[in-house]
């Protein structure tokens, strides 16, 4: 089963990422408008300051009055103070608005990921999803917190400077713009190269996050097989590739910025050279030349910033495309428009000529039909890959079938509310997932379950035997995946979690497979009581654990080949008997 690549993810998104990003700003349109007004004012102040000093130079030259300098200083100071206040207000608005939008995007993405079907998670590495929710969402922060507004400010500033310079002296303005075509070419080249380098950085970062997520989770296996050095070499290779990608990105900026600076200095030198002659000829004043010199410096700065900001904007759009691709991903298992909500689930299960393939092509279940009445205990046995666990996945509708029907209490599960269906099924797996928190929260799973019910469930499955011995009992902290508990203790917590939610149907995928003999003895009695009055479906490899089932179904290559009680199947002298004799022989040999 191949994983879903970044290219595949991006190809699924067909919308306009920038327009989609801008749509998140609609709820804050008032604040954004105020921010743009402040930007226009700040741009006006930037244009006014050189004019203020230039006029002061000309007035002092003609009048020789020091009051001109004093008045100019006061005006300049007031402009600086007002600019500071406006800039502070603009920054506060941008940061607050940007963080709220990022909060919205991150929550929307997480909620959507929760709604996706199991098939999506089968194909998508966890590390990539973590990167989307963290790094890629954070990449949008700079865009919302400044890039868009600074882009607007720099564009307005460039236009304003060009208009004012032409108004002051058209000839000198044209001289100032002589190097502009070269700057524009460099800017376009920079944008193209920087976008490519950024995409490479993001890809390498995703690769290393995926590697870390997988290998840290599987560190025990790495240590058991002594693969630390090999894995470190793989990590070094991926880390070096990320370093090289960052280095190339840095070099692009390191070359572009000095080039723009050199061109701005050359332009200034040309203007000062020509402008000085015009001053000597009396064509323009010294103040006008000063204004031009300041405007040229201001003119090239926003051009450089525009190129870098466009690059950052493109980077944000690249991250947004990945995010919106996930948001555009449709759950394969969809809720019915008018789902049926049963007042009470009795637990009757029927498979009617069911065909199922995880990839839609290679069937793992072929024409499977059976009926389980409420309260019956049914076990599925067979070799690995026979389709036993697939049946469990289909009962909870984690996947949809290609052909046939599955009914719960006579209702097609595709018509039932997914929440109601899954809440009626208590699924106990071999690989128990324990969340960080405490024991009580892991049993309750933050549902509306009273502590008395939590404790009663733990006592019922004998989990209280080890919980009561802990220093903080039910408030005992639990580390990630419950690493401080034994496999048997984690299974007991899983049993208690299932019981606390009072399901009508029990599904056990070799639920006692990883439990030691002593712990298994403790829970067998609890399981017998637990299964009374509940439809129970068991998948077992150890046939000794299911001999008392009401019905045993033997699966082989996706089909039910035999069915009956333990004794009936032995009498058939078929697949089940062979499996049973093999296990008996193995036990005797051991």
Model-based region annotation:
Residues 1-48, 61-74, 90-94, 98, ...:
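Membrane-integrated ABC transporters
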Residues 2-9, 62, 99, 107-131, ...:
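Short intracellular "coupling" helices and adjacent cytoplasmic loop segments at the cytosolic face
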Residues 27, 31-44, 79, 146-200, ...:
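Transmembrane helices of ABC transporter permease
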